[in-house]
Amino acid sequence: MARLKEFYKKDVVTMMMKRFNYSSVMEVPRILKITLNMGVGEAVGDKKVMNHAIEDMTLISGQKPVVTKARKSIAGFKIREGWPIGCKVTLRRERMYEFLDRLISITLPRVRDFRGLNPKSFDGTGNYSMGIHEQIVFPEIDYDKTDGIRGLDICITTSAKTNEEAKALLEAFNLPLKDKDRK
């Protein structure tokens, strides 16, 4: 079993039940899924870029991504409906906890000038979104073999009803959120 999953079952559930006065263990919020999304606008001009993005995403997540296609044609961006413009991966269960563990303990400390994640990135219903500007901060990506620097979006979906519950859950997992007084 993943280290963070054991930690959640043993420590986080009891801490959250005390803090929010839940009557049942099933009321305690949990992380449902983590979605990684990489928009690859350069793939319009060069098809190899998409293949490199798929390789990077596979290395980062541990599973093959789904290629996202343009929903409609936009002349200003020079894209047509159905053209590949990105890729995404949805992580659940064991892989999700393993990815979160790597993200918190290895990847985020490697980000240049990192001072914590923005605590205002909650969406109001208990989900947290963040962006990574360079995919090379992940230890799985070899800097010498990469063709370019691309960013990706990470969305952590929880079963929490409010932002306060979701923030408490993610802080229990040691996700480094900034303090409100410190900017």
From Swiss-Prot:
GO function term, MF aspect, one: rRNA binding
Listed GO biological process terms: translation
Pfam families: Ribosomal_L5, Ribosomal_L5_C
GO CC annotations, alphabetized: ribonucleoprotein complex; ribosome
PROSITE patterns in UniProt: RIBOSOMAL_L5 (PS00358)
InterPro entries from the UniProt entry: Ribosomal_uL5, Ribosomal_uL5_bac-type, Ribosomal_uL5_C, Ribosomal_uL5_CS, Ribosomal_uL5_dom_sf, Ribosomal_uL5_N
Keywords: Ribonucleoprotein, Ribosomal protein, RNA-binding, rRNA-binding, tRNA-binding
Domain of life: Bacteria
Description of how the protein assembles with itself and partners: Part of the 50S ribosomal subunit; part of the 5S rRNA/L5/L18/L25 subcomplex. Contacts the 5S rRNA and the P site tRNA. Forms a bridge to the 30S subunit in the 70S ribosome.
Protein family: Belongs to the universal ribosomal protein uL5 family.
Function in brief: This is one of the proteins that bind and probably mediate the attachment of the 5S RNA into the large ribosomal subunit, where it forms part of the central protuberance. In the 70S ribosome it contacts protein S13 of the 30S subunit (bridge B1b), connecting the 2 subunits; this bridge is implicated in subunit movement. Contacts the P site tRNA; the 5S rRNA and some of its associated proteins might help stabilize positioning of ribosome-bound tRNAs.
Protein name: Large ribosomal subunit protein uL5
The organism of origin for this protein: Legionella pneumophila (strain Corby)
Lineage of the species this protein comes from: Bacteria, Pseudomonadati, Pseudomonadota, Gammaproteobacteria, Legionellales
